[in-house]
Structure formats: C-alpha cells, structure tokens
Curated annotation (Swiss-Prot):
PROSITE patterns: AA_TRANSFER_CLASS_1. Transaminase involved in tyrosine breakdown. Converts tyrosine to p-hydroxyphenylpyruvate. This is Tyrosine aminotransferase. Keywords: Aminotransferase, Cytoplasm, Mitochondrion, Phenylalanine catabolism, Pyridoxal phosphate, Transferase, Tyrosine catabolism. One of its GO terms (molecular function) is L-tyrosine-2-oxoglutarate transaminase activity. It is an enzyme of class 2 (transferase). Belongs to the class-I pyridoxal-phosphate-dependent aminotransferase family. The keyword Mitochondrion applies. The modification N6-(pyridoxal phosphate)lysine is found at residue 253. Its EC number is 2.6.1.5.
Amino acid sequence: MSSWDVSMSNHAGLVFNPIRTVSDNAKPSPSPKPIIKLSVGDPTLDKNLLTSAAQIKKLKEAIDSQECNGYFPTVGSPEAREAVATWWRNSFVHKEELKSTIVKDNVVLCSGGSHGILMAITAICDAGDYALVPQPGFPHYETVCKAYGIGMHFYNCRPENDWEADLDEIRRLKDDKTKLLIVTNPSNPCGSNFSRKHVEDIVRLAEELRLPLFSDEIYAGMVFKGKDPNATFTSVADFETTVPRVILGGTAKNLVVPGWRLGWLLYVDPHGNGPSFLEGLKRVGMLVCGPCTVVQAALGEALLNTPQEHLDQIVAKIEESAMYLYNHIGECIGLAPTMPRGAMYLMSRIDLEKYRDIKTDVEFFEKLLEEENVQVLPGTIFHAPGFTRLTTTRPVEVYREAVERIKAFCQRHAAV
C-alpha cells in the first residue's frame, strides 16, 4: 500500500501572522515575576476597559429571542448595516452635503478587522498587482498580500513628523501595477492621529494618482486630547473627492469586544468611479457567509445607544496610561518614546549603542521577556527596526511595575 500524500497547500504555507506567532509562541520566561503583557492590542485585559451594560443586555436578548439562529444575508443584516451607516454619518461626516454618501447599501459586514483587511485587499488586487502599504504598519496587510501573491510597495511614515505618511515617496513608488493605496489612522503601531490637513493631502494624492483608497479606521474617534484639547479624528469620508474609498471600522477597540469578531467595510464613492470595488467586497464576503448573527443583532444598540460618556471614559483611561508610559519610559537607558496621540499604542526608539550586549530590537524583546517577564513587541514586526511597540490599555499601576522592570533591565545591559 502506498503511503498517504497529505501535504499543506502552497497557499497555506504563505500565511504568516507575525504578531500572533510571536505573542502566542513566546517561550515562558524563567523569571519568577508574573508576566506583564504589553504586546497584543486586547482592550479586555484586567477588565480595565469594559463593554457597556446596554450592549451586553442586547446580546443576551438577541440570544433569548430565538430570532437570530439562522442565516442573515452575507453582507450583513439590513438593521446592522443601517446602524453602521447612521453612526458613521453622525459621528465622522461633518459636512452636511456629504452625509447622503454614507448609506446602508454601501456597508458590508465582516468577521472582525482582520477579515475586513483580507476582503478589502483581495476585492481589488490580483496576484501580481501591488498595494502601497505604510511602514511602520499593521502586519496583517503584509500577511494578506503575501498569502495571495500581491506585491507591496512600502512607504514610510516619519517619526520626526508625528508619523505622517511620506507623500512624495508614495508618488515615487506608484507604478502601473499599483492598484490600491492603504492608510491607517489612528495608527497601529504608531499611536498617531493625522491632522485634518494631512488626511486631506492623502485624499488629494490618491485623486492625483487615480488610486482607490483603503483607509483602516478601526480606531476611529480614539484620540487623545490632553496635549491638544482641539485634537479630533478625521475620516477620509469627510471630503468631497472623486476617489473611491473603502473604510474599515469595527467593534473590537472602542466598544471593547475584540472576541465578538464584528467589523464593517464602508464604501464611499458618490461619483461612481469604482463600483466593482463594492461588488468585489460582496463576493469575497461570500467565502465566510457573514459574521455572527446574534452579534449583528446587538450592533445597533452598541453603536447608537452606548452613552458618549462611556466611550469618552475608555479613551481617557487609555490616554492616562499612554501618558504615564510616555513620561516615564524615557527614564530607561536607551529608550526614547514618541508622543502617543491616539489608538492604544506607544512606539519607542531603541538606541542600541547604549547597550553592551543587545544588537537588535528582536534581541531586546527576547531578553526583556526572559529576564523580566515583560512582553512587548519588536519594531521589526512592523517594518520599524530599532523600535519597540507597547500597548497602552492596561491600568497605570501595571505600567508603574513595567517601567521599573524595564528600567532595571536596561541598566543591567547598559554599555560601560
């Protein structure tokens, strides 16, 4: 009898998620100290940030109703899609003449933000095409592109300019095979929030280059105001332009339910220049047949009836932790943080010359975990060698302990 030939597909072999691989497979530290995870952007740790009671109540009612146990349309239920359109229109589109462009029929639900990224990229890009991708950037863009044979032109976001995108570099990188421009605002991993002018400059550049725009706005509204009381989030939906735009949003971050796996893609194209983009979203969504139905049933309550004070409190807690970390991590030898302005992350430069036996950001990550049981992420994962990323969602007391451990670690490895 011949042996079985059961081998992994070439496609599966191309799939690699660096954040999950590093965080899920890190070797246990021999340190007796309890682990401090500052690696994965999960806002539910410690129950420091809580889902609203009304949201939980609505989910329970949906389960008990026996009305949500069957199939919904693959694009999502009409009620959930209407809730997304209404919330986005009322929250992030300030020009009255543009509000009519945000409609239910242009919303496609997805099973979380990562699924939305896959849908948006593969809806318009074939193998051999290219996407313009930010660096530092969320690694899942690269995960999807590599899995589907899509090339990437990486453009820089500059730390010296509050992590703004290098627009001249985007212009130079664009070629005949480029099909899509990807932007992230507020940014994972940078913790940045673009000014309205910079968002408009990106939109105008996409217009000039005739490139559809995929805007990852999963952290919409999560902006810090302590240093700038006038700081605000600007969506690419809030501009009159001929650019077809697909905007990613979801419940994972500001509504504190990443495990519910519910996001959305909002197509904005009042001039009708990219209708096949929307059709592509609908088709690739059929591969999963839509997100969880009971969660869809709770979406309207979550978006439209969660008290603004609850959402503001979530952002305020994240900002408090972010600013504590920013104000104290620089006390550690070799670390120079950049100012966090939104999302739930802080990036710090690592001056490797300050250490006698740490040569890369990956070594910094590995040794810090081994010796102090503090888990951060190396900047290399985000195409930012020489940096480290720390999450900012945990209580301040956690960061007090983390800073003390990191400080001791850096002192121990400091060059003489």
